Amino acid sequence: MFHVKQILSLTFLLIVFLGKSQSALVFKESPVLSPAMDDKVVLTWNEQQGGYNKLSSSEKEFYYWVNYSRLHPGDFMEKIVRPLIKVYPQLKGGNLNSLETDLKSVTELTLFSLNDGLLSMAGSHAGNITSANAQPSHVSPNGEAFEERFKNFGLKNCGGENISYGSGEANPLFMLVMLYLDINVSNLGHRKALLNPQYVYTGISIKKYKNGNAFLVEDFACSQK
């Protein structure tokens, strides 16, 4: 089980979704059961990816549920989101309703492959932000914006980035659900990135601030051909 105090999520998406949005929500600590990660298709796919064994346990968990949600969007709604809403009923509302519509109408999506450039990019940004004790942002402490970082790591075509901040024991699955809900985010940019059929590659990094709070970065890219 896990306890969640605060989640802050931000998004910056190139090509399709331009601009920034952010939302901060504070929750009373509540215990939530952690579902088993036992989908063989997702596990086999993930474990075959180059760079997978370099991920931390939290990063592997986040990667699992991201790909599970793309392979089984309807099941993700029923088996993951709904049980969470029972614990946090304050999450009910228009965003939950639209998420249900989106997850039940979307067809099965391609599972994300790990990309070395995106892994390095996500890890570098998460590390730079936390080591500098900087506020969660898509702009690095040295002033580099997402577009610059994307290009500097040898990536091209379209791409995007989701970031999330969690205080206390920030659970990867909870952070993902909050990104999907996109409460107070008018353009639903996080959700659109996660369900974007053009995005086929990802890189994930979760780093800790000195106070133990977590900063998550997930970068995306289209085909690099």
Model-derived regions: residue spans:
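Acidic/histidine-rich, surface-exposed loop or edge segments in extracytoplasmic proteins
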Residues: 39-52, 99-107, 157-161
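Helix-centric, low-specificity signal for extended rod-like, repetitive segments
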Residues: 13, 63-64, 184
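N-terminal low-complexity, Pro/Thr/Ser-rich intrinsically disordered segments
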Residues: 24-60
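Short, well-ordered surface patches within globular domains
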Residues: 52-153, 197
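Bacterial Sec-dependent N-terminal signal peptides
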Residues: 1-24
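A well-ordered secondary-structure block
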Residues: 124-223
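Calcium-binding acidic motifs and repeat modules
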Residues: 51, 223-224
